[in-house]
Structures are given as C-alpha cells and as structure tokens.
Design a protein with these regions (language model features):
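Vicinal oxygen chelate
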Residues: 1-32, 36-50, 73-119
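Short hydrophobic/aromatic beta-strand micro-patches
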Residues: 7-9, 59-63
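Short active-site oxyanion
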Residues: 55-57
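Beta-hairpin (beta-strand-turn-beta-strand) motif
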Residues: 61-65, 102-104
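Short amphipathic alpha-helices within nucleic acid-binding modules
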Residues: 65-72
Length: 119
C-alpha cells in the first residue's frame, strides 16, 4: 500500500480548480503540492455518501483492489473515474479511506490531462 493523496472536502473555491463533470465535483491537482493535498468541492446532487462529501479521507494505491476490499465495509463500490484507475471507498473507524488500483501502462500524463480525457 502506498500513499496517494489526502482528499479534503470544501465548499470554498480554490486556485487551480479542475471541474470533473462526469464525477459531479471540482478538485485541485494533488500532484502539484508536496503533501498530496487534494481539495474537493462536490456539486449539488453529487451521488456520494455524506461521509465522503464531508469528512477528509486518505487515499492509498494498492496492487490488487479486489484483495484490498476483502472483509472491508465498502461505501463506494469499485469504479473507474479516469483512464487506467479503479477506485473504491471503505469506512475504517468511522472515516472514509480511498483505495486506488492504477494501471501504469495506461496511466501516463498529468492528473489534469487524464481527467480531461474522461469528459
């Protein structure tokens, strides 16, 4: 398991916003700062649990998402928000945790470039 980012929900606007209409949210590029912070503003009607929309989460890359989810309380089922990435959210001790499986043979380019491909 490898650290990927910290997602912090906010209702405020922030510099370098990236709109992700297919996800009903706006984010910052977590790769553009040394601490992996990703600001996240969820749009009205975004189809996510309140826990994810209101509580910060930590995200980890895993080699095998299915194995990592075994025995966990899954709150967002595995899905592919962008090319080469499959994610799921679990609930651990009352907090959301994001798990990502990344196909490095597909996942090339910057965070912003890859998300723009999915629009």
């Amino acid at each position: 398991m490898k650290f990927n980012h910290i997602g912090i929900p906010t209702t405020d606007r922030f510099d370098g916003e990236i709109d992700l209409p297919h996800l009903s949210m706006t984010v910052s590029d977590h790769q553009s700062n040394p601490f992996g912070i990703q600001w996240q503003r969820y749009w009205d009607g975004a189809p996510y649990p309140d826990l994810v929309k209101t509580v910060p989460h930590v995200a980890f890359e895993v080699d095998n998402l299915a194995e990592a989810l075994a025995g966990q309380e899954v709150i967002i089922a595995p899905n592919s928000p962008s090319q080469g990435v499959t994610v799921a959210f679990i609930k651990v001790a009352g907090a959301p945790v994001e798990l990502l499986e990344i196909d490095r043979s597909v996942r090339k380019g910057s965070f912003e470039q890859l998300h723009r491909l999915c629009r």
